[in-house]
A protein has these predicted regions:
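A short alpha-helical cap/connector motif
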Residues: 1-83, 87-111, 115-256
Length: 256
């Protein structure tokens, strides 16, 4: 299943009222949105029809989130759904997650693109192939180690995979407090240490299986006042049926 097809189904299942997209490019994923949307990209070239209430910012995500109130564009409402597809380097992906979670709610969903490189070359920090994921892939290992309370689901979409992250806690400072330590351990010079099980997609679930799972109802029906602990507990009880590839807390070589 193509990643855009999967993302379209995610929008349909959650019916978000607010959406954030980091990394717009030509706008193909942005075109899926039908709600109040904040889109960030310093060099977008949108070439498709957009059908949402859009606030488009030609800037970097770091600059955007450094503003006094990043939620002005949503009239103070946190992001219900976010798609992170910015600069394909671990430090940027990590900062984007930290900023996005801080402006989300416990019932929100964050989706990363480009988490399943098909070779060490494709995962290189310095791009030299036609298709490039960069070293975003270690974010799975980072979240499993530092934020084990989160529900994370790698999805085997075409062509470079997605990662769903839920059970968010906007008050968490764990990643920000350990930012330098995380990069010292998980950021590597090229060639990248991409495990064979990652190349073979053994860490990811089939897209349709994820779409058919029952955890979507937890996010869709959650109260705006639900606590992170409550959402995390409900998600864990639903997502356990997805099996070993989902939510494993073992170190799987994603960058450690």
């Amino acid at each position: 299943m193509r990643y855009l097809t999967f993302l379209d189904q995610v929008h349909a299942k959650l019916s978000p009222q607010t959406y954030l997209e980091i990394g717009v490019r030509s706008g193909t994923s942005l075109a899926l949105a039908r709600c109040r949307t904040v889109a960030i990209d310093p060099a977008f070239t949108i070439s498709v029809e957009i059908q949402c209430d859009l606030r488009l910012f030609r800037t970097t995500s770091d600059e955007y989130f450094n503003r006094p109130d990043p939620l002005v564009a949503t009239e103070g409402r946190p992001f219900d759904l976010a798609f992170i597809d910015g600069l394909h380097l671990l430090e940027f992906a990590l900062r984007d997650f930290i900023h996005t979670e801080r402006h989300s709610s416990p019932r929100s969903l964050i989706v990363f693109d480009d988490v399943l490189p098909r070779s060490p070359d494709e995962a290189a920090r310095v791009p030299h192939t036609r298709f490039w994921t960069g070293d975003v892939y270690p974010i799975m290992g980072v979240l499993r180690r530092y934020r084990p309370e989160l529900t994370i689901i790698p999805v085997d979409t075409t062509s470079r995979g997605l990662l769903l992250v839920m059970g968010l806690d906007p008050q968490s400072q764990t990643l920000a407090d350990n930012y330098d330590e995380i990069l010292a351990e998980y950021r590597h010079p090229d060639p990248q240490p991409v495990s064979q099980e990652m190349v073979d997609r053994l860490l990811a679930l089939p897209p349709q299986r994820v779409l058919d799972a029952t955890f979507w109802s937890v996010l869709a029906k959650a109260s705006a006042n639900a606590s992170p602990d409550q959402i995390q507990l409900e998600l864990a009880s639903h997502a356990a049926s997805l099996g070993a590839a989902f939510g494993s807390r073992r170190e799987s070589g994603e960058g450690a």
